[in-house]
Amino acid sequence: MAIDYSKWDKLELSDDSDIEVHPNVDKKSFIRWRQRDIHEKRAVRKQKMEDIKGAMAMNRRLLSRISEMETVLEKESPSDPYVLLGSFLEAKKSEDMDSAIPGGMSYHHMLMSLLKVIKDAEDTTEEKSMDDSDKCLRRLKSHKERLLKLLEDAQKEYDTLEAESKNYITSEDLHLGFDSTYVQKKEPEKPKKTKTKKETIQVIESLNNPTPPTDFPGAKEQASTGNAPKNPVNENESEDEEGLSLSEDGKKFANIDFGDYSSSEEFLKEHLNILADEEESDAILLEAFNAELEGKPSLAKQYVHQALLISYCRQLGPNGLSIFFQKIKDPNHQSQRLFLEDVHNTYVRIHERSAAISKEQAESGEGVEQIQLCAVDPNTKLSITIPEAGSTDPETQKARAAFESFPPNLQKALMTNDLDKINVVLGKMAVENAEEVVEKLSSTGMLSIEEGIIDTTKGETIPQLS
């Protein structure tokens, strides 16, 4: 097969050109001279083409205005055409004040000069028998024809120069054939939620050392949980679970119906950040586990289905999304059967584990987490002060409003100032509500601490309000 070298025909000169030069002339110097000559001629040609384009644009605009002047004369046929055309050009002055060439005459001045040339021109033999209007019209048409001829010649010269510039390849002719770039904008990372650890401290009172250490946190009062965790391993597991936070996009994806693969595919393509976060599928599986514990098996299975979709698509990568969903949408394809089997097996494991946890909790009799009030220092005592009703003091009014916002049974317990009765009521309340009650008691001053002075002669503690 013959090799086609025609694509190199447009190379005007190259460093390895087979050029025969005089023996006294260095070939490299000759090639450099030829290159400089080519670039100079190319620059001159380019500038000439720009000048021709500018002249053509100027002549087209002048031609347009001369045609308007012709139309005005043909319609009016005045006795003094130059006054009429002068008025017409003055009316168009604001439009024609820009210059065709930077630093040159404006279009208005060029047209006024043309009108003066037409007026001062000597009459020809044919024009002697014409009136002024016909003379002016004839001379305008003559200038119009001259401009048309100039435009035609300029266009031919421009086409010749353009064809000459395309005879050889230049750097200006090089351009990108096609380019396809896809940039996936990474969504800003959402700040991770700080894990809140609930610290449970067990205080063992000793007869030999009744005074707690001075650096014990909350040395004056403590709101702690009533039941300490019995299994430290379970506590670590709960902390890991609390660290998994489901993003807003993850929540929306998890709530897509089971088997709605079209919506799932579209959502994942628009939110590729879900695939980038490896904890997203684990967080959805945790939601499935919680739903199963709450007795919502359908919702739990849906969450498992969506979590495994994320897991599969993350392994395939963004380019494999379309292929994966194309196969999984086909009920006769093996991929759908294998995927649904994986969903079923994962759900069964979650179901069995949640059932085992429920059974363990029932058998161990673990109570609900409670908030209790207790004094850490044995020499101190917690005391409740009920604010007076109808007081004019703003702080007392604020405390009274907080007291009246409590449930009636809690108000009765607080009025007894008996810590055991108060703790019974707090133990029956939800943890969040009980914490809010303790916060209000402390902030309004209803909860105070009584410090005692030990009378060594009688072995009694003398209460003293702090």
UniProtKB/Swiss-Prot annotation:
It is found in: Nucleus; Cytoplasm. The keyword Transcription regulation does not apply. Transmembrane segments: none annotated. The keyword Phosphoprotein applies. One of its GO terms (cellular component) is cytoplasm. Its main location: nucleus. Residues 204-249 are annotated as: Disordered. Pfam families: CDC37_C, CDC37_M, CDC37_N. The modification Phosphoserine is found at residue 238. Keywords: Cell cycle, Cell division, Chaperone, Cytoplasm, Nucleus, Phosphoprotein. One of its GO terms (biological process) is cell division. InterPro entries: Cdc37, Cdc37_C, Cdc37_Hsp90-bd, Cdc37_Hsp90-bd_sf, Cdc37_N_dom. It comes from the Eukaryota. SMART domains: CDC37_C (SM01069), CDC37_M (SM01070), CDC37_N (SM01071). Belongs to the CDC37 family. Forms a complex with Hsp90. Interacts with sty1. This is Hsp90 co-chaperone Cdc37. It comes from Schizosaccharomyces pombe (strain 972 / ATCC 24843). The lineage of its organism: Eukaryota, Fungi, Dikarya, Ascomycota, Taphrinomycotina.
